């Protein structure tokens, strides 16, 4: 799902590493320690929460979070909470990064000072206001000026303690006067529609005879202002809560009798500034924010075609895809969009086979094969993440969940044993876990995804051809990925592979570390097992597995997953879990009478059906076959005055569901839409609002079977692979090429230098792999031309958008400093281009 903007789609995403907090204020009690967690918020909407770290003022979280951002936002915020068992969790402090500042911290570990949180720091939202100055004749026949202040609506007000019942006060204030008026309270909404007008007398009637038409006294104008304050009506004894304010000097009407615009709400001038930022501690974050502006598909044809034929270029180092890996600062930065694009078009196996073969030819020692962070390694890693996640979950998740729930101690380091623990018992528990995981892995070969098997086959063939005297290299070439870079990391950090929702507790983490080390060594088939461990206790423990049957099992498994033409005939019939989690659903109304209330349920989606039950593991209360899903669409907030709602439309009724936040709502809508995309009876129109009180709220039709009034969203073509958009990935690659244009040009120079000079290579060119200077130069020329054409399209789009942009519109309210900077930059660009 993307924001549509006149011929192009805008995608936003963010990848966050929440590291640790330092020097949090101590708890005011004898213990002084705190139980803290961190939340990630789009403005104030929570979209992710870390685990709770107990009894620490320097909690380490070590959690990663990625999401597609489905709406506009101003701040990416992080709140540190202190858990309270008996009361509401209290906020220690927050970090708020403006959207426009995210690039300053792009992919860098940064320490941020925690800021104090109060009503002023939480101000958000915008207000639509009109001021109109007019002349009126009083009862005595005297003409005077009246000011009409019309407040239309507000959007995106903060929600306070789970509710928002807003009202506004409109005040005309000056040195010697203050006249306030108040709107009605709007219940249960943070997007109130007020549409109320308030009138104020601006000048004395006697002043009219001294001034010309609309030329009222300057001293009054300069000193008067309109102030709009938003409040949340509260029943608490502490009074109503401040939501934000707007101050407008009346002199804006000096040149026009009316003024209408949208404004961002601001904190009060006298906001609480008592605490210094460093009083609250700091938080370490790594944030990667990406915004892609994607044109229609034909714009990307030249660059996309160049990338897709990379596997056929001789040598492969002269291909566009390989060049991308050469110029990017981080190979993974290149691998992510590259693999997704090639996987989408069925070209990932030929390309990886080509670059793997080239890398093997450059490798001198079979013991170091595929051990570096090369483009080959990163591309295979990314392919395994995309294609192998379900395989990984089916293989490991049941045992990992059992380990996390059992909390058995498996510590085998005598130095780290706790009082009362028995070394032999711990060693036996660990041995059983390792044995179980080793068995499920080595028996899972038939379930390994085909694309992974095809890649492993090419690795095996290339390694065996290069090192013909080493009989084990055909195994180590494959095990270096499937064990060392797939299974072992997933066991070590299961949260990074969605095997657990959060980082595991210290004891479980230690158990998983020991298991991961052992599995990694078993899979590596190294000649000297004991020498693989630095710790003597690990060498002792490994004696349990120093039998030929374990090596044979590994080799049989590696043979199976690297065999040519291997296919899993059962893979299509197997139910694949795609997504699950708690949401709130509205009763479907199978009975004609009775309350249709909202209930929290555990939802589960597979490639066969969509179900919900009371709790995870219970029997389903409702099963919806995928073929019965006719459409999945958003539900307008006005239907039930609830945010983040969507509807799953079936032949007889619609199931109304509320997700926990906007990110989850987008994820569920996307995956439900994609999994039901091929249904033959999919609807073309739908009702965007609910059927309540005998009619549809959107079109007022009275029949509950009336045809929809709004076209269904198009979704993606039926043959598209899940979660991959080829045009978006090409746009991402274009952005990388454009970012590293200087390196592309430097690489061109290196090709020219190599073509005419056979002497020692210049140091500045030595970082590039250039096997054929002429072929590489030819590709570089095509890449630079394709990137240049796309850059011209982007520049034209920016110019067109700038011409249409109005400061003070609903999209660009007044009060956004970053937008003012954007206006200034675009003005300079436009002037320069002229």
From Swiss-Prot:
One of the record's GO molecular function terms: GTPase activator activity
Pfam families: BTK (PF00779), C2 (PF00168), PH (PF00169), RasGAP (PF00616)
Keyword Transmembrane: no
Zinc-finger ranges (Btk-type): 679-715
Gene Ontology BP terms: cellular response to heat; intracellular signal transduction; negative regulation of Ras protein signal transduction; platelet activation
C2 domain span: 1-112, 123-263
Disulphide linkage map: none
Sections of the chain in a coiled coil: none
Sequence ranges assigned to domain PH in this UniProt record: 576-677
Modified residues (Phosphothreonine): 110
Residues bearing the modification Phosphotyrosine: 66
CDD domains: C2A_RasA2_RasA3, C2B_RasA3, PH_GAP1_mammal-like, RasGAP_RASA3
Function according to Swiss-Prot or TrEMBL: Inhibitory regulator of the Ras-cyclic AMP pathway. May bind inositol tetrakisphosphate (IP4).
Name of this protein: Ras GTPase-activating protein 3
